[in-house]
């Protein structure tokens, strides 16, 4: 149960906690009041964002997905997400608090479904990829204990810590350190020069707020085991949320044999986090430990000028060739009330710090690169009013030359991409992608990155582009390697400085010889099994099978991927790029005739039956990761615009003869549609169930022609993240994605919404984003949460018992669950660990004592409409036969069927699942093909 920290009086007065005991009219008034307050939070949020965007102008685009997710997960009471609760939950999971006590027949059957073989609990999911895509990476380190110089550690922003034992080989696989790390946001990694077996990993990404951190993790055995240090229990103090959420950098200095650990802590980024209680504001600053991280002391000299008790938000820490400590800063969440950004400090003794540069731009983010041969020489890259600036010093910061000097002696790189401004090679994203590093052997050679990578051989006086993110916008004629956009890290191999690694939004890239970049293969991807891809969603092709698979998945900055074919030796599927940029939601026809895929906002496309690709809608309205649905029966596409209005396109089975229009579910009251689900039980028209971000459920009938909408009364307030159906249109499962002590995130109705049952049970306080009910055993339900897959075997109980069924996937955000009944395949899309499936290979897929499948036979299969079932009539008198289509809807039923008795169907071509029942007992299930 969620821990209630309020007093009993407060609980009694709480609308969410108390409304269920009110009279229907009083409850309705309470819910309306609660929704009104939530809409006010949304309005406040929108106003805050407009202010932030105005401050940045068009120079720095907002991180739209994180803004969207912030709204969808906020506590309705406080107006802010409560990520820090996941830290306590992780501790509970580690202690085994939510370990399953029984297997679910819904999931992969490894040792049988009778509950006696507990292995089914431990490995229900199979990793499917992508195998060579990667994802956003800010932390890379060559293992100092590997004399070959081949072993590398790297951290995904939301995919945990990984190791590759031979980075020089394109076939060498990355291995996750542990599923424990899977929801850990890695921002930095370093080792102790006095004891190279000791590593420190900083967590949390303040640049986007995409993933909250959990302090610092330490290992003393080269990465085999880890302990958590420098963690402050999160708590509120007024509007300030305290905690070490963002450890941007960790470095270790050898001071005459004493290991001094420096940790750079930042508050949340103002350009992304908003209305969030000033997350980590008071903990920002530079910290130092001399006892292995047992204790840390804040260095008070690095404080904002407005408040000596408020530390600067630290961006980077570097140890110079003379053992001096350099520190750069970044913007503070407190904005003008804390002039944090644009500063560089230096200390020769690790105690007394001198400010050696101040851009007097409080919002500036500063990255540094120090010479390994000249302790007084450094290069700096920062966001500024230009909007980016490069600086250089050769005297320890006493004087600087800069690209904004009246007569500059150093210059900015200019990208060959005509879509990137000549004065901003970060393309307005200096808050996000920014890195500069000199060569460790020759410090006149400098590397820098924004969107693409550049090299200077004359101390930043001039630059040459050495990578390109695409062949668009004039880039095709540039001889350079194709390297993913958005650069975050540049690292040299200490054993061979000609070898380099680059970290970006596409993962890890490797250069074997940095003396020659005049080649399309000078820099190559090293993402083999580096599966840290962040998927917004994924959809199975309903007519495929695990041995001839196809599904589409849309990823953050890695486009839409197509998984296809049979499993490889490692169980991954072959993956190809289906569409670039940010891939969003996808859909399939129930007969596999067309595919729907998406870019951001209302940019939706279709692969038609003739194999050609067409645009369904191409407008920049709607959500960044926009909501869509397809009625596979009526072949109609729907997507949200704003409020309760939607796009509609009919005729999806045609080749570009689509009829497009706009429909509405009524007048919104400051809220919007957050989920569209198509009822599989209405077959002659479209019936939609629409969820809103205030907790409303709207039923829209005749959505494909002349819509009529009815609001279904609900007892919940929050963002409706998923709507699924049980055995009929009256059985509706709903999830909400908000944090909140009094939030209930799972609901069920079996009477079409006349009454609702709270199915929260013992579920911890965390967002729930997806849900699915076992069609053959409704007591089993799984959900996709912020901490992996959870499930229950007693959903029908008043208070279900939930457990984590997420081994392999780990504690990773699950954004969508899809299901293919014909093969009993589940697909889980994760935000940080790629795509996973679970297929129950036991055709019974239920716990029973009936005969095995050898006692049954369906023929002919495939069929053209007539089916026969053969079985031993001595064991079973007459059977009741049902057929279900790919959506799980029952489409055929016949009772009292004898062995070898003909059953004539008029079903369309496709895959179906046949279920044979002896009374109330399911005795046989099998896929059937009608053609």
Question: What are the residue ranges of the model-derived segments?
Answer:
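Bacterial Sec-dependent N-terminal signal peptides
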Residues: 1-26, 846, 851-853
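Short glycine/proline-enriched turn or capping motifs at secondary-structure junctions
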Residues: 2, 826-829, 919-923
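Generic detector of low-complexity/intrinsically disordered segments
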Residues: 15-18, 24, 218, 288, ...
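Short, solvent-exposed secondary-structure boundary motifs
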Residues: 569, 575-576, 844-852, 894
